[in-house]
Amino acid sequence: MPLKLRGKKKAKSKETAGLVEGEPTGAGGGSLSASRAPARRLVFHAQLAHGSATGRVEGFSSIQELYAQIAGAFEISPSEILYCTLNTPKIDMERLLGGQLGLEDFIFAHVKGIEKEVNVYKSEDSLGLTITDNGVGYAFIKRIKDGGVIDSVKTICVGDHIESINGENIVGWRHYDVAKKLKELKKEELFTMKLIEPKKAFEIELRSKAGKSSGEKIGCGRATLRLRSKGPATVEEMPSETKAKAIEKIDDVLELYMGIRDIDLATTMFEAGKDKVNPDEFAVALDETLGDFAFPDEFVFDVWGVIGDAKRRGL
């Protein structure tokens, strides 16, 4: 069925359409649970993170389809959406929408705001930042390390989308390709990044570094909608505490070796190894599932160690 904002509204510009009209602005409000969706008809509520009325989205099976529905509900282009957070309009990297969506989660879409171009002097081999992406072609900064090269450039913030590096457009690149590009930049040389920060409400916020805790927290004990790149979305139970901790540890290994965080990739790796009996079988499974990554042997062994620990604790 076509998506629309709740209630009748007159046509508005993008600027005035952001006014909240009689709907709660976050989780816990009355409308979030007012109409529980019947079987096979899952309805989610959404807002633009900088402020808007509440929209309803349903019937999507992938991140791309979800973005298209959110865009239709708010009369914007899907390409305007940088990423979404769950149950908070803040730029909270621990609340990013990935491949799993709780059935009662409230979606906040962060859209393009101010463009900026920054020059960075690469004084160290490591820039001190972690990259992730939204699954549909936009890479952005998930974490900035205290005291690192990027930390010294105060105009660069967590949540900024990286549009180009030294004039090369990287829209459509996956996070690992962007991280590799940045890593390969020559030391002791200046480089330029074009960034787009998410549009913000009229409030003053401190520059966020996203903390030192793990990425998106994987909850336990409730149902979730699992979005897939191929095939229909499925409703699943949230993982056990042991499995959730193992996936977060794999995400830590991804950050250590590749400079990225991706809870969905970590989940895929865990699923590929949970029924394997040795690291050789696991390596073969990774090649079959994620062959494009060409993971080094030491990385595979570290991930296998995490999975082995989880097995010993009981999944």
From Swiss-Prot:
CDD domains: GH2_GIPC, PDZ_GIPC2. PROSITE patterns: PDZ. Residues 117-197 form the PDZ domain. InterPro entries: GH2_GIPC, GIPC1-3_GH1, GIPC1/2/3, PDZ, PDZ_sf. It comes from the Eukaryota. The keyword Cytoplasm applies. The keyword Ligase does not apply. One of its GO terms (molecular function) is identical protein binding. GO terms for cellular component: cytoplasm; extracellular exosome. Transmembrane segments: none annotated. Residues 1-34 are annotated as: Disordered. Keywords: Cytoplasm. Residues 1-12 have a biased composition (Basic residues). Expressed at highest levels in ascending colon and at moderate levels in adult kidney. Expressed at low levels in adult pancreas and at very low levels in adult liver. Expression is down-regulated in several primary tumors, such as kidney, colon and rectal tumors. It is found in: Cytoplasm. Belongs to the GIPC family. Probably interacts with SEMA5A. This is PDZ domain-containing protein GIPC2. It comes from Homo sapiens. The lineage of its organism: Eukaryota, Metazoa, Chordata, Craniata, Vertebrata. The gene is GIPC2.
